[in-house]
Amino acid sequence: MASVAPYMPEGRRGIHFMQQWFNLSNPAMEDALHDAPPFRDFAGLCGLDDRLPDETTILRFCHVLEQHQLAPQILKTVDDLLQHKGLKLKTGTVVDATLVAAPSSTKNATGERDPETMPSKKGNQWYFGMKTHIGTATDSEPVHTVRGTSGNVNYVAEANSLLHGEETEAWSHAGSQGAGKRPDAKPGVRWNIAMRPGKRKQLDPEDRPIEQLTDELERIKARIRAKVEHPSRVIKPQFGHLNVRYNGLAKNTAQLHTFFTLANLWMAGKHFQGAQAEVRPTCLKAAGKPPLGALTPGRCHEAAAG
């Protein structure tokens, strides 16, 4: 893409995307380029004189994305393209957050915690890591805004930052109660936030017509909010992003922007003919049995073909 071209050759972008699809470390990506011809083809390294990048070169490209804040620009470019193709991204917004686990101090190689990740309680369970906050359009699934924070940041604290500024309706779960009354609330936006579970249990829809309508309204809210779960389903079980890979929120947030860029293309495949080929080109489908355990044909098919 044009935003990346001044900093690195086009092939580096393809290598970076393959890293995310197959959840590969820098050394594993270097090995895959040497051992799997389809990976070299996708990166444009097909000639005999082409020099394959080593793990240090691959790492430098990640640093370039982070330092110049290119990953958010790539996400915006893809969203603009999808919108130009007819996908509605500027209507209402559904916001959500999900926890991504980080190594604890006992499992970390250095024996130290990442100072930018914090513990967070969900239900009766404690987690240690970061939170991924996203905003998606109500009429479609692609993500338009991504924010990365420590695990202890409350959902409502980031709710208004996930709006693109052109919507009049916003939707969220009960954890965002009070979003419309915060100092950073945007004028003209009406928040449709789920009722707290305890209050909803007290409803008596069978004997009270008004509470029956309230219960039905909560069902409608839940159906609208359900779309925001789809992008996380793509990047977690399909792309394998179950734990943070780096130390520091900046590096992990840059990776999240890339993940959701690829997830947007994957999800847009059902709206546009041929969009799946943009996510995983044909050359990767024919990779056969790769040398690495992480690159099984089934995993390759799941990660991009759907």
Each predicted region: which residue ranges?
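A short, flexible helix-boundary coil/loop motif
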Residues: 238, 270-306
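Short, solvent-exposed alpha-helical "recognition" segments
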Residues: 39
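Acidic, contiguous segments within the catalytic cores of piggyBac-derived transposases
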Residues: 221-222, 255-259, 266, 270, ...
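A short glycine/serine-rich beta->alpha loop
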Residues: 1-5, 47, 246-250
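Polybasic low-complexity intrinsically disordered regions
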Residues: 8-13, 27, 31-34, 44, ...
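Short helix-capping/linker segments at secondary-structure and domain boundaries
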Residues: 21-28, 142, 239-244, 264-277
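Helix-centered, glycine/charged polyanion-binding patches within enzymatic domains
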Residues: 168-169, 174-250, 254, 276, ...
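Basic, short loop/linker segments at the boundary and entry of helix-turn-helix/winged-helix-like folds
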Residues: 1-17
